[in-house]
């Protein structure tokens, strides 16, 4: 896969706990006070879950297909996604819309697999643009989809709670592959279904 990420290491709970403890000290907190005593361990457990996608492969998610001889659009809309901005390590969240036309063999994947694929890539330090492209590319590379469209709409807390402080602003990204990229009418039809 073209994930452009370095070789994977297992999550190091001990190191993560130590880092959170040091961060608390760096911001002027006492990590030994009652309310924070368990925080390094809790944050390490949370990050193990939040970044679990680093240790997953899209072929594992999309390996099961069904021979339906379906050559028309499959679209799953309004998939909730939660990710972490790699620049500030704060959340961004919103919805993903994933559509594809199966490959010439007509094989489709389970609908839940599209949501799992979005989750897998979202559970990494991310930028929304890459997240959108990774989902689209996986559908082409693993499922051999003829056409793919992925649209993601998110609010970024790095824009809402710091810096420019614009809560409610949303960012929309899209990735279009295959026939949808070449055929403006087909692309417009899918976009109208996403917006309906």
Swiss-Prot record:
Keywords: GTP-binding, Hydrolase, Metal-binding, Nucleotide-binding, One-carbon metabolism, Zinc. Its EC number is 3.5.4.16. GO terms for biological process: one-carbon metabolic process; tetrahydrobiopterin biosynthetic process; tetrahydrofolate biosynthetic process. Zn(2+) binds at residues 85, 88, 158. Pathway: Cofactor biosynthesis; 7,8-dihydroneopterin triphosphate biosynthesis; 7,8-dihydroneopterin triphosphate from GTP: step 1/1. SUPFAM superfamilies: Tetrahydrobiopterin biosynthesis enzymes-like (SSF55620). It is an enzyme of class 3 (hydrolase). The keyword Manganese does not apply. GO terms for molecular function: GTP binding; GTP cyclohydrolase I activity; zinc ion binding. Pfam families: GTP_cyclohydroI. The keyword Nucleotide-binding applies. GO terms for cellular component: cytoplasm. It catalyses: GTP + H2O = 7,8-dihydroneopterin 3'-triphosphate + formate + H(+). Homomer. NCBIfam families: folE (TIGR00063), PRK09347.1-2 (NF006825), PRK09347.1-3 (NF006826). Belongs to the GTP cyclohydrolase I family. PANTHER family: GTP CYCLOHYDROLASE 1, GTP CYCLOHYDROLASE I. This is GTP cyclohydrolase 1. The gene is folE.
